[in-house]
Amino acid sequence: MLPELRSLYMKTKADDYLMILPESKEDFNREGRENHNCVGGSYFDKMLQRKCTILFLRKKEEPDKAFCTVEMDGDRVVQCRAVRNSTPPEEVTDFMQRYSREIAVRIRKRQQEKNAQRIKVAI
C-alpha cells in the first residue's frame, strides 16, 4: 500500500515498539476486531484516498498482537488509541511524541531533496 508511506512512517528508532503500515482491508478489519475500535470501517478507503494515514503500533515482543491504532496527518498524531478506544499508557504517549518529531525531520528532508531537484532541473 502506498510505497511512499512505507519509507516515511515505517522505520523508527524505538527499542520497544514497531510501527506497522496496514497492507489490506483485512488488516484494517482485524485491527478493528482485536482492538474493538472503528478502524475497520471507512479508514481503509480514506487511506487509499490519502485523507489520512493509519498505522498499527505494536510491542516488539508481540508484533502480531493488536496494541494501539494510530492516525497520522503528516507528522501530527491525530489520534492514538488502545483497546476499546482507551487512552494508551503514558510510555506510548511519550513514544508517539518522539516518533512525530522523527517524522517531521523526514518530511523536511524529503522537501529539501525535492527543492534541490527542482533547482537542478531549472539550471
Predicted segments, located by residue:
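Catalytic-core elements of nucleic-acid end-processing and repair enzymes
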Residues: 1-123
